[in-house]
Amino acid sequence: MVHGSVTFRDVAIDFSQEEWECLQPDQRTLYRDVMLENYSHLISLGSSISKPDVITLLEQEKEPWIVVSKETSRWYPDLESKYGPEKISPENDIFEINLPKHVIKQISKTLGLEAFYFRNDSEYRSRFEGRQGHQEGYINQKIISYEEMPAYTHASPIHNTHKPYECKECGKYFSCGSNLIQHQSIHTGEKPYKCKECGKAFQLHIQLTRHQKFHTGEKTFECKECGKAFNLPTQLNRHKNIHTVKKLFECKECGKSFNRSSNLTQHQSIHAGVKPYQCKECGKAFNRGSNLIQHQKIHSNEKPFVCRECEMAFRYHYQLIEHCRIHTGEKPFECKECRKAFTLLTKLVRHQKIHMGEKPFECRECGKAFSLLNQLNRHKNIHTGEKPFECKECGKSFNRSSNLIQHQSIHADVKPYECKECGKGFNRGANLIQHQKIHSNEKPFVCRECEMAFRYHYQLIQHCQIHTGGKPFECKECGKAFSLLTQLARHKNIHTGEKPFECKDCGKAFNRGSNLVQHQSIHTGEKPYECKECGKAFRLHLQLSQHEKTHTGEKPFECKECGKFFRRGSNLNQHRSIHTGKKPFECKECGKAFRLHMHLIRHQKFHTGEKPFECKECGKAFSLHTQLNHHKNIHTGEKPFKCKECGKSFNRVSNLVQHQSIHAGVKPYECKECGKGFSRVSNLIQHQKTHSSAKPFVCKECRKTFRYHYQLTEHYRIHTGEKPFECKECGKAFGLLTQLAQHQIIHTGEKPFKCKECGKAFNRGSNLVQPQSIHTGEKPYECKECGKAFRLHLQLSLHQKLVQVRNPLNVRNVGQPSDISSNLLNIRKFILG
């Protein structure tokens, strides 16, 4: 051997059993990496050495056992009982046994090398026999478990004269003093090698060198199949399994296969429920030591991995790698089924289960199955109610650490992830990725029933339950069932009244962070979502999506009861309650019940008098933001929605839809009392109140009652004299916007409503309906007292007042409708007293 040349033994690292057991799983992985990397560097320097047996075993991720024959066991009969056979081969009279290095040395002195059969036997034996002076080193490098010396040897371990430096802690010898100093740091815990980039410290210099590659981005180990590069050889070896797809180790419990025995062992602990590694901080247990180490970083708050783009810090290096792909847009893992690409292999594996439909993890409580174990673990918290992670700001608890971290960003108001398309910021990279799909219009998830496409898988799941009608999540308070767990969680806040998210501008509180974010855009006036058809801008993407359907006319959701179509599934669900008549939301003030919770909230503001939304033009305040938006159109005069039939324009799409039903003549909503049809359900609801005679709205001034709140508002203006709506043509003022709209037709002379029977035109749709009944002869309004029928509800009202005053006025008979005018004076006198 040439003096000064480097051999594999010069760079090999040895461990005793005591040392090996002190190492954490990630440190054992480091050993594999270091040994493989050292060998790789020697080859790259031009060393013409054959591959050591230990390298072959490490590449295959096998344990390097020593193999002993039965002949040896006759000379040393207590070997088998002392150390135990690992594998017996009756044909060759051979068994595997785990021996300490000094026992191997002692046996080889007595019986020679023929007592042993080494793996890769001929190759290893020739090298071993050629290096008699290095027997101990070659066997020691194979990570053989180190035991106490058995009684039969009667000798101390033989120490090589080339290793004069002894460790006083464990008795291990080293050839260099520097190696001894490095080794002693294992016992002392000293970490003298510090990274200048992030400050992290290490026990060994090789660990620091490996770590620095994360900062430099150096990736010297490249896959020949796909060209992907890695920092470490073990990473490359694991990656190669993706291409070979060898899975030799199968779980007997669930049939799942693995390409490494260690992965199978780790997986089997899931079925066994064994979790020997417990956190001293919070008591949480894990089935792997590496998982415990990762978990403990949550308590220490250590985040050594920093992104150079946005300076965001992470606990784990894999999190930094995943995060960096948000900036680069790299998605190296592609699904062969639908061509969708992912930033991480784990996400691809998770996605592929959607196509396979595989769900091996089942909940023992309710039988629900999941494709991933972490999904099952999250689901279990529903049954246990456990929420160990608490926010120090507001006291809210979560069942997952990631949810707590996401929640805390709401308080910190940190939004490091910015969309390059529209500039919107997000506190999570996942939210940015979801948001970017809005701009790309990508919708890879398609419903098999109706072929409707969705951007996200959860939207598809939610949509499918419209077809199946499945609602597995039930509220224990009121029994209401929901198709999604998030809907149930949102609903529960109605009962608890909890609203932890408060607006700093106006103090209004919300039960969801997303609602607060939506609300804050009211103060900023930001409207980033613009319609490409008409240029109208919206605060929320949902509003834009709804608006776009007005241009396309798309209505995929059909009511099976009456055949009506809707643009949104939520609108269909709301509509269904009309047929069922169910009204689960009741006002505690007046007992009035509502079909929807939002209707109850709107109603309650009438009792409280709360009007937080004020018009900057005229100072008028409103209880709802939508009311303010409608009001603003009075000042701007904007009417973007135009009827194609008659050219009339409207400031709201709902008004246009309502108007179009006049031309179509469609009236799907029929009153069960009198059979009258209506084009809108709200009109039917208003009409039904005429039959019930309920008048819940009372004037505080004169105690007069009204069926509708708008009637009370209109009536108040009689007392106050307020007339806020002024005609710009003649200056005349009105108490109601509808009165102003009717008046303005006088100036324009517009009469868009034409009778098909006689051709007569009218400036109001209600005026058209009245003469049409002349042609049809229809009289739907009947007096319950005398059975007389009328064409118009106004005629019925006047008739009922005549009947009411008949006795006090000594009126014996009420004749034809022409008699009404002759009695008006008497009615007026009676009413005024």
Curated annotation (Swiss-Prot):
Keyword DNA-binding: yes
Pfam families the record matches: KRAB, zf-C2H2, zf-C2H2_6
Gene3D superfamilies: 6.10.140.140, Classic Zinc Finger
Keywords noted in UniProt: DNA-binding, Metal-binding, Nucleus, Repeat, Transcription, Transcription regulation, Zinc, Zinc-finger
Zinc finger annotations (C2H2-type) as residue ranges: 165-187, 193-215, 221-243, 249-271, 277-299, 305-327, 333-355, 361-383, 389-411, 417-439, 445-467, 473-495, 501-523, 529-551, 557-579, 585-607, 613-635, 641-663, 669-691, 697-719, 725-747, 753-775, 781-803
InterPro entries: C2H2-ZF_domain, KRAB, KRAB_dom_sf, Znf_C2H2_sf, Znf_C2H2_type
PROSITE patterns (alphabetical): KRAB, ZINC_FINGER_C2H2_1, ZINC_FINGER_C2H2_2
SMART domains: KRAB (SM00349), ZnF_C2H2 (SM00355)
Location relative to the cell: Nucleus
Domain called KRAB: residue spans: 6-77
Main localization (coarse): nucleus
The keyword Transcription regulation is assigned to this record: yes
One Gene Ontology term, aspect cellular component: nucleus
GO annotation, biological process: regulation of transcription by RNA polymerase II
SUPFAM superfamilies: beta-beta-alpha zinc fingers (SSF57667), KRAB domain (Kruppel-associated box) (SSF109640)
GO molecular function, one term: DNA-binding transcription activator activity, RNA polymerase II-specific
Entry similarity comment: Belongs to the krueppel C2H2-type zinc-finger protein family.
Function as written in the Swiss-Prot or TrEMBL entry: May be involved in transcriptional regulation.
This protein's name: Zinc finger protein 780B
Organism: Homo sapiens
Upper lineage: Eukaryota, Metazoa, Chordata, Craniata, Vertebrata
